[in-house]
From Swiss-Prot:
Zinc finger (unnamed): 59-95
Protein name: Protein E7
Gene Ontology molecular functions: DNA binding; DNA-binding transcription factor activity; protein domain specific binding; zinc ion binding
Motif window: LXCXE motif: 22-26
Task of the protein: Plays a role in viral genome replication by driving entry of quiescent cells into the cell cycle. Stimulation of progression from G1 to S phase allows the virus to efficiently use the cellular DNA replicating machinery to achieve viral genome replication. E7 protein has both transforming and trans-activating activities. Induces the disassembly of the E2F1 transcription factor from RB1, with subsequent transcriptional activation of E2F1-regulated S-phase genes. Interferes with host histone deacetylation mediated by HDAC1 and HDAC2, leading to transcription activation.
Highest taxon of source: Viruses
Gene that encodes the chain: E7
The record's note on its domains: The E7 terminal domain is an intrinsically disordered domain, whose flexibility and conformational transitions confer target adaptability to the oncoprotein. It allows adaptation to a variety of protein targets and exposes the PEST degradation sequence that regulates its turnover in the cell.
Length: 99
């Protein structure tokens, strides 16, 4: 650009398209490797669907509020709920030191 006022001639308009390499350099893995990836577990069963659950309960000794985050299946979290509603209790770190 020359001067204070820009004109169309100041811009380069004679751009040429560049050649682009369209060759794909991706390497595919063997079909035997793919089969190994699809097998989950020793019996070839798929892993169960798990989720994170936040549990708020109280210490069975001092009644302090305890917060836990666990990863479990829906069925197993129901089993834990049954345990917590029964005689199963969780002890806070302070009470575990005193025991």
């Amino acid at each position: 650009m020359h001067g204070e006022i820009t004109t169309l001639q100041d811009y380069v308009l004679d751009l040429e398209p560049e050649a682009t390499d369209l060759y794909c350099y991706e390497q595919l893995c063997d079909s035997s490797e793919e089969e190994e990836d699809t097998i989950d577990g020793p019996a070839g069963q798929a892993k169960p669907d798990t989720s994170n659950y936040n549990i708020v309960t109280s210490c069975c000794k001092c009644e302090a509020t305890l917060r836990l985050c666990v990863q479990s299946t829906h069925i197993d979290i129901r089993k834990l709920e049954d345990l917590l509603m029964g005689t199963f209790g969780i002890v806070c770190p302070g009470c575990s030191q005193r025991a």
